[in-house]
Regions:
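Flexible, glycine-rich surface segments
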Residues: 96, 101-150, 154
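Solvent-exposed loop and edge beta-strand segments that line ligand/cofactor-binding
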Residues: 12-15, 59-66, 113-120, 199-206
Length: 242
């Protein structure tokens, strides 16, 4: 609300006014449903406004609900604060130090990188990202990202449930917590996984899986609906061989 007063509803709820950047990072804004897919049909107003108009049913920080539109708002915050689109801001600070040169990121109708989706990278570039994460922000001897940030981002900050569900549905899933990679906790835009690992993932099975105990990174690109099945194959066949 403080960052985008121009997009704020006329009478914002107290819960809406409480949302912080950390709530956006941890997908714990207090929404009980994800407005992302609905936003794609919105062309007559800002997606930031659409995000703010979505009902905040719980106190921020108390309910996990996977929400890519919240990540879009993070991208918008970077653009407003720096004057650069997210992809341009990251080029000299992240992509170029990792030797990643060809990056494409979809933009919204209002000229903001989508943030939570639409980033196109080669598989080997995803592996570079994973290696940097494994090495706590270092790559080729340079500290690209502060180690403290990697530690916080990859640690469980909030309890979580699979995308498409919210924490109100969590109790029925706890009995399978030991076999689910979506019940291990959520950090800053990254999931915790089994075997004390963590990951960045994209729709339909795009994974950067970081396994510190094995000093390993596993990267996949795929088109699969059952993303847990893909991870199960990694744990069954690749993990024991590491």
């Amino acid at each position: 609300v403080d960052i985008f007063p121009e997009h704020c509803p006329e009478n914002p709820s107290e819960y809406l006014k409480e949302i912080t950047v950390e709530h956006l990072l941890t997908m714990s804004c207090g929404h009980s449903t994800d407005p992302t897919h609905e936003s794609w049909e919105v062309k007559d107003r800002s997606w930031i406004r659409f995000f703010m108009e979505h009902p905040v049913t719980h106190k921020p920080g108390t309910l996990f609900c996977y929400n890519s539109l919240g990540t879009y708002v993070l991208s918008a915050i970077v653009q407003k604060r720096t004057g650069e689109k997210l992809v341009d801001y990251l080029y000299p600070r992240l992509f170029r130090p990792l030797g990643i040169n060809n990056v494409s990121w979809i933009e919204s109708h209002e000229g903001i990188n989508t943030g939570g989706w639409g980033l196109f990278l080669k598989t080997e570039d995803l592996a570079k990202m994973g290696l940097m994460l494994l090495q706590k922000g270092q790559f080729n001897g340079c500290q690209v990202v502060p180690a403290e940030w990697i530690e916080s981002a990859s640690s469980a900050q909030v309890p979580c449930v699979p995308a498409g569900m919210n924490s109100d549905d969590a109790d029925k899933l706890r009995k399978v917590a030991k076999t689910s990679d979506w019940l291990q906790g959520y950090g800053y835009q990254m999931w915790r996984s089994r075997y004390n690992s963590f990951r960045a993932d994209g729709a339909n099975g795009q994974y950067i899986l970081v396994i510190p105990e094995k000093n390993a990174v596993v990267v996949t690109t795929a088109h699969i609906q059952d993303m847990q099945a893909e991870l199960n194959l990694i744990w069954k066949h690749i993990y024991p061989a590491l």
